[in-house]
Amino acid sequence: MAKLHDYYKDEVVSKLMTEFNYNSVMQVPRVEKITLNMGVGEAIADKKLLDNAAADLTAISGQKPLITKARKSVAGFKIRQGYPIGCKVTLRGERMWEFLERLISIAVPRIRDFRGLSAKSFDGRGNYSMGVREQIIFPEIDYDKVDRVRGLDITITTTANSDEEGRALLAAFDFPFRK
């Protein structure tokens, strides 16, 4: 079992119960899922780029990504409905905890000119979204085999009812928020 999950069960739950005066352990917010999304707009011209992006996402997450297709045609972007334009992975359970551990301890500190993550990226319901400009911050990606530097979106979905609860949950995991 992931160390971060054990840490959550042993220490974070009790800390948040006292901080927010919950009556039940089930009221304590928890991480539900982590979604990784990589939009590959250039895939319209070259389908091979989407395969490379999917391979990168597989290496990062340890799970095969779902190819996302365009919902509607947009003439300005030269895309038609049903064109493959990206890929996404939804992590839950053990893989989610392992990814969160790697994200906090290894990947985020490797971001260039890193001064902390914005605490304003909560959506109002305790879910946190962040963008990563380069996929090479993850140790699973071999720098020499990268054909092009791509970014990805990471969304951490929690059961928190407010941004304050979500922020307290992620801060308890030593999430590096900007002061």
Curated annotation (Swiss-Prot):
Keywords: Ribonucleoprotein, Ribosomal protein, RNA-binding, rRNA-binding, tRNA-binding. The keyword Translocase does not apply. Disulfide bonds: none annotated. Pfam families: Ribosomal_L5, Ribosomal_L5_C. InterPro entries: Ribosomal_uL5, Ribosomal_uL5_bac-type, Ribosomal_uL5_C, Ribosomal_uL5_CS, Ribosomal_uL5_dom_sf, Ribosomal_uL5_N. SUPFAM superfamilies: RL5-like. GO terms for biological process: translation. Gene3D superfamilies: 3.30.1440.10. GO terms for cellular component: ribonucleoprotein complex; ribosome. One of its GO terms (molecular function) is tRNA binding. This is one of the proteins that bind and probably mediate the attachment of the 5S RNA into the large ribosomal subunit, where it forms part of the central protuberance. In the 70S ribosome it contacts protein S13 of the 30S subunit (bridge B1b), connecting the 2 subunits; this bridge is implicated in subunit movement. Contacts the P site tRNA; the 5S rRNA and some of its associated proteins might help stabilize positioning of ribosome-bound tRNAs. Part of the 50S ribosomal subunit; part of the 5S rRNA/L5/L18/L25 subcomplex. Contacts the 5S rRNA and the P site tRNA. Forms a bridge to the 30S subunit in the 70S ribosome. Belongs to the universal ribosomal protein uL5 family. This is Large ribosomal subunit protein uL5.
